[in-house]
Regions:
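N-terminal beta1-alpha1 cap of cysteine-dependent amidohydrolase-like domains
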Residues: 1-81, 195-242
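Glycine-rich beta-alpha junction loops
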Residues: 9-11, 150-152, 191-193
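Structural motif
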Residues: 54-58, 90, 186-188
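Glycine-rich nucleotide phosphate-binding loop and flanking beta-alpha elements
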Residues: 62-63, 96-98, 152-154, 193-195
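Cysteine-nucleophile active-site neighborhood
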Residues: 62-136
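A glycine-centered loop/beta-turn motif at secondary-structure junctions
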Residues: 171-209
């Protein structure tokens, strides 16, 4: 298949190596015999989401996030239409907050979000920087990574991580984290999240094939990624039980 990835604001929203989520997805899809084009969408640039197979945005500073919101919100109707059509999307880090109804910054200023989801985000001056060990209903493997966040997100009815044994979730310590509905996935976890979690990468690939109406063939497993996940999961689980 010929597949297109839309990478929104890669220069602005790419903290913590977020771009690697696109790199590993592209490589995996190509190893499966697909031709993959990555289209970089810069601030103010137009994007045709109707022909996208994967939409991605990474993490940025709080200031960068507001700049991204200013331009991304102009594409709100197109993003919602693509989500309704089943286009696979991943929003990593604080780009997740753009999907909600509002973002309130640490000075109390309120910004309108896309309204793709019903949650709200309130940012604080205090940051939470810590490792994460959690669980999703999508598969059995633990979800690992780390967060560097300053927000409390309320109103998420369908989180990506159902529970956490370590780390701050949407509303506080060890609670549900992220957002997932249909083919839209979002999480504050970095690492990058798809590199740290091969099982979640597999979910993305399967969602892309499902949207295309194609049967997903066997997905190649990167042994270094698999070993990295196993070691990280073992170490974090041990810390959880202390």
């Amino acid at each position: 298949m010929e597949l297109k990835i839309l990478h929104f604001y890669p220069d602005l929203m790419s903290l913590y190596g977020s771009y690697a989520n696109v790199s590993i997805l592209k490589r995996t899809l190509e190893e499966m015999g697909n031709t993959v084009t990555v289209e970089r969408v810069e601030l103010g640039g137009d994007a045709d989401l109707t022909h996208a197979d994967f939409v991605y945005m990474g993490a940025g500073t709080e200031r960068a996030q507001k700049a991204a919101l200013l331009y991304f919100s102009k594409l709100g109707d197109a993003v919602k239409a693509a989500a309704d059509a089943g286009v696979t999307m991943l929003f990593a880090g604080n780009s997740m907050e753009l999907l909600g109804k509002t973002i309130t910054d640490d000075a109390g200023k309120v910004y309108e979000g896309l309204g793709l989801a019903d949650f709200t985000a309130v940012q604080n001056k205090k940051r939470f920087v810590e490792d994460v060990y959690g669980h999703t209903d999508l598969y059995e493997d633990a979800v690992v990574g780390f967060v560097n966040r300053c927000s409390v997100i309320t109103g998420v009815e369908t989180p990506l991580l159902a529970s956490m044994d370590m780390g701050h979730g949407n509303e506080g310590p060890c609670g549900p984290e992220g957002y997932h509905k249909g083919s839209v996935f979002a999480s504050q976890l970095t690492g990058p999240i798809l590199v740290k979690n091969p099982a979640l990468l597999k979910v993305m690939v399967q969602a892309i094939y499902r949207h295309r109406g194609e049967t997903c063939p066997e997905i190649p497993v990167d042994q270094y990624m698999a070993q990295g996940w196993a070691i990280t999961a073992e170490q974090l689980k041990a810390r959880c039980t202390k």
